[in-house]
Amino acid sequence: MKIGIIAYQGSFEEHYLQLKRAFDKWSINGEITPVKIPKDLKDIDGVIIPGGESTTIGLVAKRLGILDELKEKITSGLPVMGTCAGAIMLAKEVSDAKVGKTSQPLIGAMNISIIRNYYGRQRESFEAIIDLSKIGKGKANVVFIRAPAITKLWGKAQSLAELNGVTVLAEENNILATTFHPELSDTTSIHEYFLHLVKG
């Protein structure tokens, strides 16, 4: 199994370590590779789009010619996990808590609506306990950093975890989106669930 991690910015190292832990837990002989240009997408079984600044990630991906290819592969069934800014990249509808609708480059493959900077500047980062029983796990303490919120889901998109009634983890077929940072959490539950998607 070969997992690619988009490596322009964001927590590449942290995702790498969580994936390694999940591989070890499941006794999977897996390979993890950084993805920056289209040829890096060749032969991968799944891809992670980490946090960072979603507009920057989109613009760099577009400039390096990977955005369209990524969209095509995800639409064709490549398992993907987008965390925080990565979730924004996957959404079909994006607006900003302050400025409203945005026109940033997106993959736009998931039937969700996301509001960027949902929790406002006062809560730039915080931790919260969420219930992961819908993915067969218990409660987990997770980290939110300038987090967005999934405010609407339609089609086959479904909510897997909420915080105060707002979706923070969603899935649609081969796509997993989190508004928190699972790579900064004590648990490998989210990465394990992603590997379960990859294994099919």
UniProtKB/Swiss-Prot annotation:
Pfam families in UniProt: SNO
| Protein residues bound to L-glutamine | G52, E53, S54, R116, I145, R146
Q: What is its EC number?
A: 4.3.3.6, 3.5.1.2
Q: List S-S links within the chain.
A: none
Any one GO BP annotation for this protein: pyridoxal phosphate biosynthetic process
Instruction: State the InterPro entries in the record.
Output: Class_I_gatase-like, PdxT/SNO, PdxT/SNO_CS
Recorded metabolic or biological pathway in which this protein acts: Cofactor biosynthesis; pyridoxal 5'-phosphate biosynthesis
Query: Which keywords belong to this entry?
Result: Glutamine amidotransferase, Hydrolase, Lyase, Pyridoxal phosphate
- PROSITE patterns attached here? PDXT_SNO_1, PDXT_SNO_2
Task: State the function annotated in the UniProt record.
Answer: Catalyzes the hydrolysis of glutamine to glutamate and ammonia as part of the biosynthesis of pyridoxal 5'-phosphate. The resulting ammonia molecule is channeled to the active site of PdxS.
Name the PANTHER family on file. Answer: PYRIDOXAL 5'-PHOSPHATE SYNTHASE SUBUNIT SNO, PYRIDOXAL 5'-PHOSPHATE SYNTHASE SUBUNIT SNO1-RELATED
Q: What does the subunit comment say? A: In the presence of PdxS, forms a dodecamer of heterodimers. Only shows activity in the heterodimer.
Record-given protein name:
Pyridoxal 5'-phosphate synthase subunit PdxT
Q: Report which gene this protein is encoded by.
A: pdxT
